[in-house]
Amino acid sequence: MNQPNSLYLALLIEAKWQNPEDFHFSSDFAKHWLLEQGSLSRRLARHCQHLTVELMRNEKSGMGQLTRQETQGLSPEICLIREVVLSGDQTPWVLGRTLIPETTLADQPYDLATLGDIPLGLTVFSAEQVERDALQVAWIETPQGRLLARRSRLWMNHKPMLVAELFLPDAPIYSRESV
């Protein structure tokens, strides 16, 4: 993992999450991106010719390696940790970190542990039963300035996973704003 991605990931993990009703959105444009209920991957794909995934980490880990914030809303068990960078036309747009409990991996129509360079959102939102709840948002201070982030719990066929996403400096969410 390169140094900027390591820094971004550390900042994402330690984000000070807020409920949307308590958050100061910089614009309605950013608010719509952050509160997106559907697949972020699909939304990003509409803004480029080629959406690609760089898989940085895809391994199981015990709950002891997760922060207290991360374990809220998930059962205390081993999780698959999937960390990726989503890029549009070779420009990094979103750093994502997903925690998928072992019980969520079991009995699914898709093998979430072997997605590789397939966007998670395209797979999850292809399932019959998908819901998003516990959506929170944050500003994250970086050496390049303030960046927006969100996290939520996705339910795929009634089984949870926690998804956190940091919108990198060149992401389309900033195309109509100055942060």
Swiss-Prot record:
Entry-linked InterPro entries: Chorismate--pyruvate_lyase, Chorismate_lyase_/UTRA_dom_sf
Entry EC no(s): 4.1.3.40
UniProt catalytic activity: chorismate = 4-hydroxybenzoate + pyruvate
Alphabetized UniProt keyword annotations: Cytoplasm, Lyase, Pyruvate, Ubiquinone biosynthesis
Binding site for substrate: 82, 120, 165
Pathway recorded for this protein: Cofactor biosynthesis; ubiquinone biosynthesis
Cysteine pairs bridged by disulfides in the record: none
Chief location of this protein within or outside the cell: cytoplasm
Subcellular location: Cytoplasm
UniProt xrefs under HAMAP family: UbiC (MF_01632)
Protein name listed in UniProt: Probable chorismate pyruvate-lyase
